[in-house]
A protein has these predicted regions:
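Bacterial N-terminal signal peptides
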Residues: 11-26
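Early extracytoplasmic/lumenal segment of secretory-pathway proteins
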Residues: 31-98, 340
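Extracytoplasmic ligand-binding site segments that recognize negatively charged/polar headgroups
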Residues: 42-46, 68, 72, 84-220, ...
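Short amphipathic alpha-helical coupling segments at ligand-binding clamshell hinges
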Residues: 51, 61, 190-194, 259, ...
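A ligand-binding cleft/hinge motif common to bilobed small-molecule-binding domains
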Residues: 95-99, 221-242
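A bilobed periplasmic-binding-protein/Venus flytrap-type ligand-binding module shared by bacterial periplasmic
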Residues: 139-144, 183, 256-269, 288
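Periplasmic-binding protein-like
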Residues: 162-170, 279-302
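An extracytoplasmic/periplasmic, membrane-proximal ligand-sensing/linker region
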Residues: 295-340
Length: 340
């Protein structure tokens, strides 16, 4: 009888021990560490931060955001190689993504993500997506110049008559993309002549917002910028004196460019990284971005609700992000003409 009781007690004790062990192994202390993604963000800081916060709120996946310039971060990814901590790269322009994709640093995006966007705004090999779009414009001050007196083509700003009347940002990725568009449309010589004329007769600024404020304050009559800077300044100051002019007839002055993103091939969390990329292309993710910056959503069927000129009314040149390549030729020309 005593032996039977001893065996029963031993069996109960073993069962209790296994139960406790099972509970311990499923407790938070023994659970797998939660995933944290690293986003290399070349877009504007507020855009990347808001996107990361919204994605974490939806999925529970934390996103560590590292901010830098698009070109700087692309170079860092190439230097880091397989050791890169980056999971997703989000650039303000497409050339850095084009460059990384061509050199094999990006993983192919999920088909469902690619199919949510127009094919002309994703990489041909599927390694990156265009997230949102913006258009090049001329911001002008009506107190200094009438809209009807603006040139018919952005190329005309290189003429002597515009001396001291046009501002631009030679270090801007979008300006460099515009130079590539001129190369594609008119040839290298025309692009070099344009850059040479701007250097001789235009005013250079350190960044686009500084340039735009120069127009707003009457320091210069016109500047070449992206449309969303004007809306950002309007949000900050209220009604503005300056206005936007949109080039037509496929002129390079109305070039459409895109912010872009891709999953890093060396990502330690490829599944979750693809989730973040898909979120950027989703309706919710696109609204988070376009509510932060006045850009056009790229998701099929979506339209801007920020009072922008309708996307379908833009008369942009037929130049795709893929056509812009890595913008190296434009950088060479800027160096040759003394702009960089």
């Amino acid at each position: 009888m005593m032996l039977r009781n001893t065996r029963l007690a031993t069996s109960l004790l073993r069962g209790l021990t296994l139960s406790i062990l099972g509970l311990a192994l499923t407790s938070p202390a023994y659970a797998a560490d939660p995933v944290t993604l690293t986003l290399y963000n070349g877009q504007h800081k507020e855009v990347g931060d808001n996107l990361a916060a919204a994605f974490e709120a939806k999925t529970g996946i934390h996103v560590n955001v590292r901010k830098g310039s698009s070109n700087q971060l692309a170079s860092q990814i190439m230097e880091e190689g397989d050791r890169s901590p980056a999971d997703v790269f989000y650039a303000e322009e497409s050339p850095p993504l084009n460059n990384l994709g061509e050199q094999g640093f990006l993983a192919k995006a999920d088909d469902s993500t690619l199919q949510a966007l127009p094919k002309e705004y994703v990489a041909a090999n599927g390694t990156w997506i265009g997230v949102t779009a913006r258009t090049r414009v001329v911001a002008f001050n009506p107190k200094l110049i009438k809209e009807e007196d603006l040139p018919k083509s952005v190329l005309d700003f290189a003429d002597p008559e515009w001396q001291g009347k046009v501002g631009f940002v030679p270090t801007s990725g979008a300006f460099q993309e515009q130079a590539v568009a001129i190369i594609k449309l008119h040839g290298r010589d025309a692009a070099e002549e344009w850059l040479t004329g701007l250097r001789a007769f235009g005013k250079t600024y350190t960044n686009n917002m500084v340039a735009l404020k120069a127009v707003e304050n009457g320091e210069v009559a016109t500047v070449l910028v992206n449309n969303y800077y004007w809306f950002a300044l309007e949000k900050e100051k209220g009604k503005l004196d300056s206005k936007l002019h949109y080039f037509t007839d496929g002129d390079a002055g109305g070039l459409i460019t895109v912010s872009s993103a891709g999953v890093i091939k060396a990502s330690k969390h490829p599944k979750e990284a693809q989730q973040l990329l898909a979120y950027m292309a989703s309706e919710e993710g696109q609204r988070v971005i376009t509510n932060t910056t006045a850009e056009y959503p790229m998701r099929k069927g979506m339209v801007s609700d920020r009072g922008l000129k309708p996307f379908e009314e833009l008369q942009a040149p037929k130049i795709t992000p893929a056509d812009l390549g890595n913008a190296e030729e434009a950088l060479e020309l800027e160096r040759d003409t003394g702009l960089l």
